Amino acid sequence: MTDTRKFKATDLFSFNNINLDPLTETFNISFYLSYLNKWPSLCVVQESDLSDPTLMGYIMGKSEGTGKEWHTHVTAITVAPNSRRLGLARTMMDYLETVGNSENAFFVDLFVRASNALAIDFYKGLGYSVYRRVIGYYSNPHGKDEDSFDMRKPLSRDVNRESIRENGENFKCSPADVSF
């Protein structure tokens, strides 16, 4: 069994088992702390409920935008390799969507590497679709930068589903065009 609880600053000393994955974006400590300070309700961890709890995954998000662009953004989500296929990522995504609805957001969005087919299929299974392709979003100091898909899922406030579009893979933009 697992427990979902708020992400605490002290968790930063216990999550190496989660972050040691080539597809997991890692950040400096001040970045994590700024999220925990500004958006504490959008940062949670999954933890084993054993006598010696172990972090199994986390999600960090934020609320941003104005007007019809007001949304919840998934900044990071990852699950430790030995805890995958247990439904933890789905639970954390559901949690963030629930908070987004409670904050009256129009949609939830996230960025995913265009080459990460497993993650893209996972998000599509949750109801997300590609809104646009961001050219060179992920920098690579040793080679060619990698594109990202901006994926979105409309929330209950977006009754007309204006936050999504068909064939989003064909709508290309630069990272400079991504602002809310």
Curated annotation (Swiss-Prot):
Q: Which SUPFAM superfamilies match?
A: Acyl-CoA N-acyltransferases (Nat) (SSF55729)
- Enzyme Commission numbers on file: 2.3.1.254
CDD domains per the UniProt record, alphabetical: NAT_SF (cd04301)
Q: Known catalysed reaction(s)?
A: N-terminal L-methionyl-L-asparaginyl-[protein] + acetyl-CoA = N-terminal N(alpha)-acetyl-L-methionyl-L-asparaginyl-[protein] + CoA + H(+); N-terminal L-methionyl-L-glutaminyl-[protein] + acetyl-CoA = N-terminal N(alpha)-acetyl-L-methionyl-L-glutaminyl-[protein] + CoA + H(+); N-terminal L-methionyl-L-aspartyl-[protein] + acetyl-CoA = N-terminal N(alpha)-acetyl-L-methionyl-L-aspartyl-[protein] + CoA + H(+); N-terminal L-methionyl-L-glutamyl-[protein] + acetyl-CoA = N-terminal N(alpha)-acetyl-L-methionyl-L-glutamyl-[protein] + CoA + H(+)
Complexes and interactors: Component of the N-terminal acetyltransferase B (NatB) complex.
- Whose protein is this, by species? Schizosaccharomyces pombe (strain 972 / ATCC 24843) (Fission yeast)
Instruction: Name a single GO biological process.
Output: regulation of actin cytoskeleton organization
Which cellular compartments is it found in? Answer: Cytoplasm; Nucleus
Report the sequence similarity comment from the record: Belongs to the acetyltransferase family.
> What function does the entry list?
Catalytic subunit of the NatB N-terminal acetyltransferase, which catalyzes acetylation of the amino-terminal methionine residues of all proteins beginning with Met-Asp or Met-Glu and of some proteins beginning with Met-Asn, Met-Gln or Met-Met.
- Protein name as it appears in the record: N-terminal acetyltransferase B complex catalytic subunit naa20
Q: Does the keyword Glycosyltransferase apply?
A: no
- Among the entry's GO cellular component annotations, what is one? NatB complex
